[in-house]
Amino acid sequence: MSYVIDRRLNGKNKSTVNRQRFLRRYRDHIKKAVEEAVSRRSITDMEHGEQISIPGRDIDEPVLHHGRGGKQTVVHPGNKEFTTGEHIQRPQGGGGGKGPGKAGNSGEGMDEFVFQITQEEFLEFMFEDLELPNLVKRNLTGTDTFKTVRAGISNEGNPSRINIIRTLRSAHARRIALSGSSRAKLRDAKEELARLKREEPDNFGDIQEIEAEIEKLSARIHRVPFLDTFDLKYNLLVKQPNPSSKAVMFCLMDVSGSMTQATKDIAKRFFILLYLFLKRNYDKIDVVFIRHHTSAREVDEEEFFYSRETGGTIVSSALKLMQEIMAERYPANEWNIYAAQASDGDNWNDDSPICRDILINQIMPFVQYYTYVEITPREHQALWFEYERIGEAFADTFAQQQLVSAGDIYPVFRELFQRRLVT
């Protein structure tokens, strides 16, 4: 069987629809490969796609054929090995294989089909079915944004938006309409001239008359301009209202001395995944980074992920700072407020009840969703149990999970931000 492999660069995305159909068809294979890649890769290593392997048997089209079962009565002329009533042993079918092993002299098979998905496709499968819970519209009056969308073709517009194909098509149609009858007459005149020259070569009068008519018709056709201002077509772009929800995500990370370097790395990887998810799925969202030990500070993205500052542990300092920023910059009646907190669970004993009170009275009534991840292989401490009481009071808007190793990051992340059915 012959195979044709199209290796064109596909610069105009002419095969995009076919590719999307293929990705939908083998979504389960691709999603499984993406999940394995996420657990294998570093979270920061998301700047390229992934190679996906699909077993050859899974890409075969269904085929109806005769099975090997059943009994058949066949006459074999010159048979010297079998007599009536004996059963002929079924031939053993050769099977293809792959991987290391010794060479064989029989068997056929098919290699796995391997293809590459882009970074955009990788992230799409990675964050599929994830969303910020309870995202609602707040204060839509006067906060509409606009996005520019294609709205067909216009006869007027900016020269930079000229549609060349539609312009040439319009010009071609106009030339046909204006010169169609002249071209038909010209064609008839040329045929008549050819007939006269062939059958009546001495009829100079008629020949000269037809040649003059041909010249007049040709001049009339050439006077039709190749391109006219009437032909110009432009891509029409209009501004479409795009009501947007304003959302802010608070990222609170414990960098105290009790956090080992491995624990800090897991926390950073969790927040990198969260940051990537937010920027990938939401056009307009503010992210506030807060680092804390005995005191809390709002920092930028670079310092949040790479600063080496450390100290003691007072978790309430981060919650107090978050509440102050909410009151100052993010009023709850205008913003969808989210928070994600990561810690190893160690905290000054007298501070854990304070954390609970701040959350219950000053933060939870105003946020859409609050997540807490505790990174520890040990038994939970006072902070975890205080947060469990918060979860009982705010079951729909508070969630907590435990991380033990880096391999838990992606499954826990999906559990926290899994799309919920709205009833």
UniProtKB/Swiss-Prot annotation:
Domain of life: Bacteria
Pfam family, one: DUF444
Gly residues bias: start-end ranges: 92-107
Region Disordered, annotated ranges: 64-109
InterPro entries: UPF0229
HAMAP family, sorted: UPF0229
NCBIfam families: PRK05325.1-2, PRK05325.1-3
Family statement drawn from the similarity comment of this UniProt entry: Belongs to the UPF0229 family.
Name this polypeptide is given: UPF0229 protein PFLU_5583
Originating organism: Pseudomonas fluorescens (strain SBW25)
